[in-house]
Amino acid sequence: GVHRAANIMVAEAAKVIENSQRDINIAFMNELSIIFNKMGIDTKSVLEAAGTKWNFLKFYPGLVGGHCIGVDPYYLTYRADMLGYHSQVILAGRRINDGMGKYIGENTVKSLIKAEKPVKNARVAILGFTFKENCHDTRNSKVFDIVNELREYGIEPTIADPQADADEAERLYGVRFTDMSEIRDMDAVIVAVAHDEFAALGIADID
């Protein structure tokens, strides 16, 4: 159905907080994943167990890009600053989410070192480049943050995304995609976007 807001300001504020709330919830999951990684605990298993409680909100760690969720919170915090209030929770969530690409890149390098694989020129594949799963849109994709972080260590990752707009990705980011059939004999594979076809992959499919 259609909900009639009291006025345009209420409608715009509602849209902003819809996306801000999601941004903050994902940021919380991302922070938990960082903590659990240091503790040696599997985040997915923790969330599955916590999800058995009827009122647990099911959000998952991941990259937050696109032109809505990662942008809308700043409209609210900017206006708050103009009114003399400095946002804390909203901006904290933004900092966490904006840093996840770098975090993933760094942890990939650490994993290579632990596996005694040479870091420079390591064969690393990134699966997915769109800003969210099961879409073609690459605008404001945070996967590019992973690419840039790996490049800092002398790694030029191989990127595959059968759903992404390849022309758009090359125009916006200067990256070219590889066919999934070429993802073989890699030192590391990062599943950056949860496309349905990636969820069905097993180790044998990329080994």
Language-model features: locations:
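Structural/interface elements that position substrates and couple domains in central-metabolism enzymes
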Residues: G1-D207
